UniProtKB/Swiss-Prot annotation:
It holds the Pfam family Cytochrom_B_C. GO terms for cellular component: mitochondrial inner membrane; respiratory chain complex III. One of its GO terms (biological process) is mitochondrial electron transport, ubiquinol to cytochrome c. It comes from Oceanites oceanicus. Binds 2 heme b groups non-covalently. The lineage of its organism: Eukaryota, Metazoa, Chordata, Craniata, Vertebrata. Component of the ubiquinol-cytochrome c reductase complex (complex III or cytochrome b-c1 complex) that is part of the mitochondrial respiratory chain. The b-c1 complex mediates electron transfer from ubiquinol to cytochrome c. Contributes to the generation of a proton gradient across the mitochondrial membrane that is then used for ATP synthesis. Heme 1 (or BL or b562) is low-potential and absorbs at about 562 nm, and heme 2 (or BH or b566) is high-potential and absorbs at about 566 nm. GO terms for molecular function: metal ion binding; ubiquinol-cytochrome-c reductase activity. Belongs to the cytochrome b family. It is a multi-pass membrane protein. This is Cytochrome b. The cytochrome bc1 complex contains 11 subunits: 3 respiratory subunits (MT-CYB, CYC1 and UQCRFS1), 2 core proteins (UQCRC1 and UQCRC2) and 6 low-molecular weight proteins (UQCRH/QCR6, UQCRB/QCR7, UQCRQ/QCR8, UQCR10/QCR9, UQCR11/QCR10 and a cleavage product of UQCRFS1). This cytochrome bc1 complex then forms a dimer. The keyword Membrane applies.
Length: 380
């Protein structure tokens, strides 16, 4: 009998073990679809980004015009740009849902997979930030100025780091050029990290909604989950194309239709919606260094999740108190996102401060306490 090429060829063997014959828990729900959705998001962003880069000029005098030229004169340039800009939003929606799934079902107990995932998130945030600067509109310019300027809060070396990052004494041509270079490079770093992420995942196998060992009941990835993923792709591309075709500027800032002008500050500088929760946490602390530390902590706190897991059960499936806390955290993140988009005025300041405090309290204090309480309740 001839050997099966799929199982004997060095390259096909790897693909086979990762995507075809991979033993998968039979009960994983739609919450396990987001990994593959993130993969397809990355592929789409790299493809549309490559096509956009072919028509883009990384120069302060030409950047804004080159983007306008792409939208007006390049065949389907408007569509490629709209898919790329809104694709970023869908990327972040998927990433936040993916992290939420990980927190809810205790997937963070696969420490290596979880830690590489956080590195992926940080790289993704950096990529999105430098990419937002490229169209060189007002919000691009001022967003770049405000966020890079935060590094000056680092004692002693801060100002030097900022001027080094800028390539001068303000955000200017060198900044735009290096941001373009980074925006081109980082997605490939994300792709590389994704492979590491998957390597660690396949070392342990997938978690499942019950959080129990599922070795006795696994099914091949193909055709069951390959088909399920294909359905997921369709359900994501439908709203993405709808948004890109019918309301492409819904999530953007109108300020970015004005070319960058260092002499005119926009009335309200704010990042894209997917960074607003962190921006709200940054603004909630009146001290610059304190704000920067809180901003960093808002994402880096995820590294502590495996250490703060005190429950005897892995998932929250059978833990109603932790569930209540989890959904309170989700609601709190929505409040932070909303506050981040509002001006720094009376009700919003205190709401932002309370929401920021709640965010850290739930993650650092209430989750472990509730877990311990639920452990006690198991004895009765």
């Amino acid at each position: 009998m001839a050997p099966n090429l799929r199982k004997s060829h060095p390259l096909l063997k790897m693909i086979n073990n990762s995507l075809i014959d991979l033993p998968t828990p039979s009960n994983i729900s739609a919450w396990w679809n987001f990994g593959s959705l993130l993969g397809i998001c990355l592929a789409t962003q790299i493809l549309t980004g490559l096509l956009l880069a072919m028509h883009y000029t990384a120069d302060t005098t030409l950047a804004f015009s080159s983007v306008a030229h792409t939208c007006r004169n390049v065949q389907y340039g408007w569509l490629i740009r709209n898919l790329h800009a809104n694709g970023a939003s869908f990327f972040f929606i998927c990433v936040y849902l993916h992290i939420g799934r990980g927190l809810y079902y205790g997937s963070y107990l696969y420490k290596e997979t979880w830690n590489t995932g956080i590195l992926l998130l940080l790289t993704l945030m950096a990529t999105a930030f430098v990419g937002y600067v490229l169209p060189w509109g007002q919000m691009s310019f001022w967003g770049a100025t405000v966020i890079t300027n935060l590094f000056s809060a680092i004692p002693y070396i801060g100002q030097t780091i900022v001027e080094w990052a800028w390539g001068g004494f303000s955000v200017d041509n060198p900044t735009l050029t290096r941001f373009f270079a980074l925006h081109f490079l980082l997605p490939f770093a994300i792709a590389g990290l994704t492979l590491i992420h998957l390597t660690f995942l396949h070392e342990s196998g997938s978690n499942n909604p019950l959080g129990i060992v599922s070795n006795c009941d696994k099914i091949p990835f193909h055709p069951y989950f390959s088909l399920k993923d294909a359905l997921g792709f369709m359900l994501m591309f439908l709203p993405l194309t709808t948004l890109a075709l019918f309301s492409p500027n819904l999530l953007g800032d109108p300020e970015n239709f004005t070319p960058a002008n260092p002499l005119v500050t926009p009335p309200h500088i704010k990042p894209e919606w997917y960074f607003l929760f962190a921006y709200a946490i940054l603004r909630s602390i009146p001290n610059k260094l304190g704000g920067v530390l809180a901003l960093a902590a808002s994402v880096l706190i995820l590294f502590l999740s495996p250490l703060l897991h005190k429950s005897k059960q892995r998932t929250m499936t059978f833990r109603p108190l932790s569930q209540l806390l989890f959904w309170t955290l989700v609601a709190n993140l929505f409040i932070l996102t909303w506050v981040g988009s509002q001006p720094v005025e009376h009700p919003f300041i205190i709401i932002g401060q309370l929401a920021s405090l709640t965010y850290f309290t739930i993650l650092l204090i209430l989750f472990p306490i509730t877990s311990a309480l639920e452990n006690k309740m198991l004895n009765y």
